[in-house]
Structures are given as C-alpha cells and as structure tokens.
C-alpha cells in the first residue's frame, strides 16, 4: 500500500474508529488538584471517541465501533457522540457488569495526575459479530487503538477486522493510545 494510496483514502474523510468511548472528568476550575476540588466538569473521553470528534469537526464522516456500559455514564457518552456528530449506530450497550472507561484528569502544569479506571471495561467486550456487522467495506479508512488489543474478546475481534481490512484493501491507522 503506497503513501499516495493512503493519503487518497484519508482525503475521502470516511472513517470507522474501533476503540473506546469513555467519560473524562476534570477538577474545576482548571488548574485545581483533584484532592482540592469539590466541583468537576464532565466530558466525552476515550481516544477513539475523541478522534471521531476531531475528524467530524473538520468535515469527516466518522462511525464509532465500540461497547459502552448500560448505565448513566454509558448513556452520557452516547449523548455526547450525538452532540459532536459522531455516528454511533455501531455502539452497543453492554448489559453485563462491565463499566465504561472513566478518567479523572487534572489540568495542572506541575505534579499532574491522570487517574484511569478500566476494570471490566465495556469496550473490551467487542466481539467478532460486532466486526461482521460493521460493513467494513463502507469505509475508506479504519482507525484502531492499542488498548483495543489489550484483552479478549476485543483483541481477537480487532485482529479479525485487520484481516478483513487487508482483504478489502482498506488502510488501517493505529493510535498506540
């Protein structure tokens, strides 16, 4: 696959992002340490969701393929995807005891902390049928993240998506995350 081919596919602005949507909270006001605040601001998180937001902001058409927890935080992420225009028809609610990824992120310059909770992360329950039902051929480019390879069944499902992408000559971009 040549660089020119990759660039031509990227320029078509039609992306499938495979990874996670999460929830990020920030101590408020900005610059406040977590242990010194009593107020937080909540935002959409997760590298794949965030890439989708930015690509959409600049004219891209993005679909996110992931799973989120079937609770208030998972539904918050879905609402945020809608707000930013990231297509979520491939996002499934996970009804087991999994949870959405959750991060507390400080905006301090010194002694910065990011605290990330990913116990039984919903996005890692992505499975082969999710990939089979995603119609990979409808996308010009696929973006994956390193964390989607961290545990089963997501790992083998994403590797299956890579095999299909190769067969269909769809370029894949990986964010180490």
Q: Which residues are covered by each model-predicted region?
A:
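General beta-strand structural signal in soluble alpha/beta enzymes
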Residues: 17-18, 90, 173-175
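Conserved N-terminal subdomain of the carbohydrate kinase-like
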Residues: 61-144
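Short amphipathic alpha-helices and their capping/turn segments at secondary-structure boundaries
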Residues: 2-14, 128-134, 157-167
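Glycine-rich phosphate/adenosyl-contacting loop at the front of the ribokinase-like
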Residues: 2-87
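Glycine-rich nucleotide phosphate-binding loop and flanking beta-alpha elements
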Residues: 24, 123, 149-150
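Conserved beta-alpha-beta core of the PfkB/ribokinase-like small-molecule kinase fold
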Residues: 141, 147-177
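Short, basic, glycine/proline-bearing loop/turn elements
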Residues: 37-38, 116-118, 145-147, 175-177
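Short secondary-structure boundary/capping elements
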Residues: 43-50, 123-128, 153
